[in-house]
Amino acid sequence: MAENIDPSAPEGSAESAVQAAPVPIHTNPGQLSLLAWIESLGGGLAEGVELFNDEEKGHYIRASKDLPSGLSSGTVVARCPVAATMSYLNFYPTLEGLPKHSFKYNRQFLRGTEPDVASAFLLMDQYLKGDDSPWAPYIKSLPKAENLTTTQYYEDEDLEWLDGTGLESIRAARLKDWKEKFEEGKMLLKYAGNTAIESYTWELFLWAMTIFGTRAFTSRVLKEFAPKSTPDDKIFSVLVPLVDLSNHRPLTKVEWHITPDAVGLKVIDGVKPGEEIHNNYGPKNNEALMVGYGFCLPDSIVDYRMLTIRAPMESPLYDATKRQNRMFPHKAHRYESSDYYITNIFFPFGDESSTIEKTVFSQNLLDAMSVIGANERDVKVIELEEDRIYIPVTNFGRSRSFLSGLCCLQQQLSNHIANANKGDYLKKTPQNEKQRNAQIYRQTQSMLARNAVAVTIWLLERAKDANWEENKHKVLNRLLDQLPEDWYGLPVRDRMRSLLTERESCVKQRELYKNHEITMHLPEKTRECFNEFTGRIQTSLDEIVEELEVDLPCLELLVYSMFIRFCVDTYKYLGPEKSKTALGPRLTKWAPLILESYPDPSDHDLLPEDSDTDYLLTTIHEAIVEMRENDIDTFKPVEEYAGPWVDKHGWLSRRSLRWAWYVAEDELLRVSYPPYSLVAGYPPEAPSKPVRRRSQDESDHEDLYFYIPALNEAEG
């Protein structure tokens, strides 16, 4: 199979020869000069291949319309002599077969600059020499600064189109880095006695660096000419005239045709008459294309989006990374942005048998978000390997961290959607090519984020819905209804539908519960007893709740806290075997997990840190004590399960209730509500905060769900 041309991939080879073809009438004078120069050095275009120019694409190569059957597979369509290339090798005069030049430099300059920076200075120098440069025909054919569209050339109103995209900071960092390299290089050339340095302006250097960045190939294309790359074995970029006129198209099957004296481009698939001949830069995403090449593809199936994961100090991920560094000191562990990404739902390099999650999210992203979403119980089981930090989410009770990570990821992605919509640039009319590229970039970034948010909604709904198999198609239709029709045609919607409904998922059904849903796994008799008891408790507390202005989240936490106490005290009082009848198999397995993970208040007095919560729980406890004194019959049925009431150590004692509240907060997940609005591009305004600091305002757009892990199929 053919290998794509990619800086990180090996090149192919070919046996085909190139026959120089007559220049067609479409070639303009500038390109004719370039082509004539290449032909004079022994290169050129294959028969039936022509240079073409139009306003939209500029100069490119294509198969002639006059060809009866197009170009066959294996044709070497363009060939550039090594003598026409420009690269770091031109600083090594002992290498034969390269053009001679008069650029003034010394060894200190080469030692003090990176290969591509040195090459940019060479290109500047040759540009200033005009017709006296051996590369004059090529340099004349290169685009002028005003025609370059990389982000480095965005100014004034163009820059506004990058607002909130992340490209702003990338652009600023690159310009700062290049400016420093420019100043350092000029200083070294001054010491080398170069008298032309005053002519080496920042603007010209920016142009030269951009030319190398947008047109150059890897030094591997010269491996037959210089097998060791350079005398000091450096990797560098190479300008390959004529061949560099081929434009990028993802997944195009092409190979290098490399000989000791030339670099050629060979097509693997046939090319029809009049069809453009493309190159393949590798699976680059639109961010890389915008920054490195100055264009953007609206429908690239190989697109993906990098996410920045910042682990706050003392967070689980931060602490785990520190421990990993101590365990594996020989390897510097830094989480790079390339580790965290979301992919296009059509991404062709994934495993078709993979789960929904791993189709859209990178494994490192899933691992990191799970660790970030870890609670006190999850932190204890974080696994450290040389190249991985993760929580074994397949073990009983460990999927909570994964679900929590999905909630965090959903929040972050919804903010990305909002940023893409910022300034309403998706609806404005671009005034030039740079603005058109920026608009396409915003749209593709928004689509990637929307697709990923749709997946998180689907997975979290799966974890919440008791009748998932019955309701999942309703969820799917609601999701698809929120997607912009002008962006999401039938093929995209069909792909989303098949992805969500036909692939397996790591997320188990029904592990998240809201309010009284948590009792559904209690056997019917036990459930009726518990619900009747808690109903009377809540009725008695209505006046207190109204007086204290207790919000809905606190009432939900109270329900969860009483449920936790009931289950763990029933388990302790009745024992494992009898608990199976009283609690059911799922809660009988869950109760000891909670007791083991959170020390009982008889050993550690775990109190809520918030003074308002402390006051609320004290008031509630006092009301429960008073209620028991006045209506002891309400408590008797429950005591058959949870044991006799003992004021200091009973299942609703002051200390026990505080402990249960603490556990409830730690086991909760905060899920965005209404979730479907996130796909439409309307994220919550307030950022996510720890549960115990949740305000009344936040209840408008987040729901509290309690986590109870599912049993394996054999256990259930």
Language model: regions and residue ranges:
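Eukaryotic helix-linker segments that join adjacent hydrophobic helices
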Residues: F91-I139
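Long, positively charged leader/targeting segments at protein N-termini
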Residues: A2-P81, Y88-P93, P137-G716
